[in-house]
Amino acid sequence: NILKGDKTGIVEPSRDHILIGKERHDIGRPNNEGYPIRGIFKGDYLYLKNFKIDRWPAGNPETGYLNSDGGPTKTAILDTYGTADKKYWEMSFGKRPEEELYNIKTDPLCMNNLAVNEEFKAKKDELLNQMKAELTAQKDPRILGNGDVFDNYRTFPPKFMNYHNRFMDGEEMPKLH
């Protein structure tokens, strides 16, 4: 058993990776839409597939990037927008590419996206194919082409439904915390 055993590292050879996914996590996008991601950690690599790259990953700017809690760090990063140090804003709140690949051993903060580097195409394709095969076997709607079903599930209390749309219409909104 991997939880109760004395061994470290890869204890069971079939358990050499982790699949990850995200759909809806905040109320700061139009029509309660999510930011769907699927990914796989394996060996030294993290591969991410961003499915709706036209959307803001941390929530829309006009509602305050609601997928990121307020605080001094968020404020400091937001203050870099429009400056020479804008890279911190881009990494935290900017739109993401369709594919991301990171070597988590040499780049644990995931700052250097290798997906655009031809040298890593084989690794990217290997991870993508394994991820898709496993998620297909699990009948993941996103991988099977019906991922928009996730945007139709009611996941927020009624007072927060359609928050973005109501905010943009000038409605006084309930406090978030």
Give, region by region, the residue ranges found by the protein language model.
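C-terminal cap/loop subdomain of S1 sulfatases and analogous C-terminal strand-loop tails that border
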Residues: 1-100
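Long, internal low-complexity/basic segments
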Residues: 83-99, 104-110, 114-177
